[in-house]
Amino acid sequence: MITAADFYHVMTAMVPLYVAMILAYGSVKWWRIFTPDQCSGINRFVALFAVPLLSFHFISTNNPYTMNLRFIAADTLQKLMVLAMLTAWSHLSRRGSLEWTITLFSLSTLPNTLVMGIPLLKGMYGEFSGSLMVQIVVLQCIIWYTLMLFMFEYRGARMLITEQFPDTAANIASIVVDPDVVSLDGRRDAIETETEVKEDGRIHVTVRRSNASRSDIYSRRSMGFSSTTPRPSNLTNAEIYSLQSSRNPTPRGSSFNHTDFYSMVGRSSNFGAADAFGVRTGATPRPSNYEDDASKPKYPLPASNAAPMAGHYPAPNPAVSSAPKGAKKAATNGQAKGEDLHMFVWSSSASPVSDVFGGGAPDYNDAAAVKSPRKMDGAKDREDYVERDDFSFGNRGVMDRDAEAGDEKAAAAAGADPSKAMAAPTAMPPTSVMTRLILIMVWRKLIRNPNTYSSLIGLIWSLVCFRWNFEMPAIVLKSISILSDAGLGMAMFSLGLFMALQPHIIACGNKVATYAMAVRFLAGPAVMAAASFAVGLRGTLLHVAIVQAALPQGIVPFVFAKEYSVHPSILSTAVIFGMLIALPITLVYYILLGL
């Protein structure tokens, strides 16, 4: 039976965390103490130092030789059961997909164990439950987050192969990825593919970042590599940040001019910018053979309302899309007056600026759209249809039928048999090629993540020191403690800043939020209870396992979802709204299990 003293211990452990979160929220939302840039700096400190050192502190001080293997088996079995059910659903059901498998797996099995679980369970069940939570943290950081990265990169690789090599994927013998490419997801970084056919007829692919996404192109003019006369540019730092990091899959306005654009690409050319756009200046007009080619789309449009497709510049200049006639005329007139070209740039990854000030629908009445040739941009035909209030899993089937109808029209226009075109599935490269590609990308992600090092080093140190009774030097111990002690409060403070920067607490609509909360707080604990019974957990261990499964959503899965653009609004709502309702829900579980 739960006593008043037990309830007070729980509140003593949890209220300070919520105080830190509310202070951060008020500092941005009510008192305007921190700007978004300052919040970004605080969040970066938390991500690079506070949380990794907090994780290292908990793991290094936990004795791995006293781990409860049955409790770990229950947690592992729960995740494997959920993963097996979701995998079967994605393959057998028309409504299933890899994206939903990843999202539902995150919602149901990956709670916020480090920040919320350890203090909450210690307050409920004592010190031994804190040790159990540390064991869960170790498995999450080393195994389950790595598995999620594997699934995300597999999705990115599949999208890359499907879009770039729809008919020749089976003939790919190797895929080499440049060192500066850290993700295969075209929404995050604009990437290009180059192919080479060897004598045996096999295709060898090289994946690299496109010229438009390379960070060094923005500094070429200051380094003296510009091919044009230096002149003041109105491309601001904010726009550079927004070009590289906005997640909105819609064209966004940018105010830099065409001369800046060519200087960034760094290509010397024997024709002027006016020739490229067919602008005739001077007393004697002369014809331009570029305008005719640029005005023709390279591929036929599948539907009347489809976005314009890209033509080609002489390589390596980016391609210019054929905009509607009004847009083309406006751009030409503006250029004749010496005005700057107003460009639209497809943006592809996550940005707090774009989250708060999200752009609207594309408007081609004022400018031409500019894209890089062969750039991976999955956003153009993979709009996040799940982030709406009227969402249902059935929408996927409707959208699939719409897409098939568009493909059928395109195939009919090209004189092909649409039924045959849709019947043949896209082949994939050999398993060895895909496995090597994904492992390389996951490895690059892991070595850039400070939590990977903190977890592994903490585990190795605990194995050594508890085996031979070593003690960490006092200088090192206190250096780590002074930061790790602040880690818990700073993590909650950072979460409060994140909540304050969002335009809506429920970003995905009420219906989707209800589904997400049901998966997080009902389905997850239910599967954990079944797995715990299966491995023989009883008594207090069973209670700890169920309450641990009912913790709010983990932050790392949301970071991955935002980075790879896989239902980020759902995970954002699960983190924010879940944190607000987690305390009463876990208290209900605690009281019911204690009856």
Swiss-Prot record:
InterPro entries assigned to the protein according to its UniProt record, in alphabetical order: Auxin_eff_plant, Auxin_Efflux_Carrier, Mem_transp_PIN-like
For the keyword Nucleotide-binding, the answer is no
Note one Pfam family from the annotation.
Answer: Mem_trans
Which ranges are annotated Low complexity under compositional bias? Answer: 411-427
Q: Membrane-spanning residues where?
A: 7-27, 39-59, 71-91, 101-121, 132-152, 456-476, 480-500, 517-537, 541-561, 575-595
- The reply on keyword Disulfide bond is no
Membrane topology per record: Multi-pass membrane protein
Instruction: Summarize where (indol-3-yl)acetate binds, as residue positions.
Output: 51, 112, 114, 145, 555-556
Main location as per UniProt: membrane
GO CC terms of this entry: auxin efflux carrier complex; cell periphery; endoplasmic reticulum; plasma membrane
Question: Domain of life, per the record?
Answer: Eukaryota
Chain ranges on the Extracellular side, renumbered to this chain: 1-6, 60-70, 122-131, 477-479, 538-540
- Which molecular-function annotation in GO is an example for this chain? auxin efflux transmembrane transporter activity
The miscellaneous remark of the record is:
Plants silencing PIN1A exhibit inhibition of the emergence and development of adventitious roots, increased number of tillers and enlarged tiller angles.
Q: Which family does it belong to?
A: Belongs to the auxin efflux carrier (TC 2.A.69.1) family.
The protein here is known as: Auxin efflux carrier component 1a
- Source taxonomy: Eukaryota, Viridiplantae, Streptophyta, Embryophyta, Tracheophyta
